[in-house]
């Protein structure tokens, strides 16, 4: 709220929850959903590093999406892709499908 005008800074008054704040809930939902459905699940919510991406993939996501972190670092997607490549190389994985999975 702008204390001088008394009006909200955001057009919709309250805004939404995104970025790191949503990650624990999003990760839990990916885990639960991936165990329940037989279609690919895309992990979204609070991904801002290669470690975050790996968590979502191990939880059962078939793919990930980076959103809010792009506002902070427009090159974050490339950094995460490069980091996933380095992770696979370091761990002798031919692809991300070789990651351990909590999806059972």
Regions found by a protein language model. Give the residues of each.
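A general structural detector for well-ordered alpha-helical segments in enzyme core domains, enriched
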Residues: 26-29, 76, 80-84
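Extended, intrinsically disordered, low-complexity segments
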Residues: 23, 82-104
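Short, well-ordered coil/turn segments that N-cap beta-strands
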Residues: 37-41, 61-62
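Glycine-rich phosphate-binding active-site loops on the catalytic face of alpha/beta enzymes
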Residues: 46-47, 51-80
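Glycine- and other small-residue-rich loops at beta-strand/loop junctions that grip anionic moieties
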Residues: 18-22, 42-46, 69
């Amino acid at each position: 709220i702008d204390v001088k005008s008394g009006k909200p800074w955001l057009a919709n008054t309250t805004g939404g929850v995104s970025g790191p704040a949503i990650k624990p809930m999003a990760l839990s939902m990916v885990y639960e959903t991936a165990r329940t459905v037989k279609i690919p699940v895309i992990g979204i919510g609070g991904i801002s590093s290669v470690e975050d991406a790996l968590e979502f993939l191990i939880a059962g996501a078939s793919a990930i999406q980076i959103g809010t972190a792009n506002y902070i670092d427009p090159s974050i997607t490339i950094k995460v892709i490069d980091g996933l490549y380095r992770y696979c190389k370091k761990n002798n994985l031919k692809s991300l499908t070789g990651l351990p999975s909590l999806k059972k």
